[in-house]
């Protein structure tokens, strides 16, 4: 039964156990190894867009960019670096207006062996999406080139294969035909703005 005063199973109360489970999983991965006995690099995640403003801090797998740098390093829609605006200012403005912001988080699994997943119903993408959508506020997910692939030609989207047998560009995001291909598994998750805000809105009592 949904409590009319707010909260319920979509509030932060039940997001916390998911976070706790993720912490345990990351600790378990720290002791794991790949097929060639190489250590598994921790799953990485970073904010790539906040309030419609994209980050211009790009490093492979999210390494080498601190949270402070990300907050100060953004770009406008035209791709030019903004000098007088940053994510903190956007956050402060939203708070001042009693509003909230959406965001896009990019997640990368740098070290994952090929062969995980299944074609069709149990593809690695569908299993990841199934888990991700358990997080309240998630409204979308894309892998690799994602929706941008719809604007590409086949020659642009196809992944060239390097001498090591792995994709060079990784436009597929680490999976082909529902099965991991040995490249980093990369996906982005869209979060809606929090619906609980101070700003007056039309409603029905």
Model-inferred region functions:
Residues 2-58, 65-120:
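Glycine-rich, mobile lid/loop segments that gate access to catalytic sites or pores
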């Amino acid at each position: 039964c949904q409590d009319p005063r707010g909260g319920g199973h979509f509030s932060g109360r039940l997001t916390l156990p998911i976070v706790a489970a993720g912490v345990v999983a990351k600790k378990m991965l720290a002791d794991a190894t790949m097929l060639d006995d190489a250590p598994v690099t921790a799953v990485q995640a970073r904010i790539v867009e906040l309030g419609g403003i994209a980050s211009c801090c790009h490093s492979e797998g999210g390494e080498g960019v601190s949270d402070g740098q990300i907050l100060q390093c953004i770009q406008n829609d035209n791709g030019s670096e903004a000098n007088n605006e940053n994510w903190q200012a956007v956050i402060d403005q939203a708070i001042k207006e009693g509003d909230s912001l959406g965001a896009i988080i990019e997640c990368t699994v740098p070290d994952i062996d090929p062969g995980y997943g299944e074609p069709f119903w149990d593809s690695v993408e569908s299993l990841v999406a199934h888990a991700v959508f358990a997080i309240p506020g998630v409204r979308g997910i894309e892998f690799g080139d994602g929706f941008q692939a719809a604007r590409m030609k086949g020659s642009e989207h196809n992944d060239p294969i390097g001498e090591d047998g792995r994709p060079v560009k990784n436009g597929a995001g680490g999976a082909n035909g529902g099965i991991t291909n040995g490249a980093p598994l990369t996906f982005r998750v869209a979060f809606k703005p929090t619906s609980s805000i101070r700003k007056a809105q039309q409603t029905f009592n």
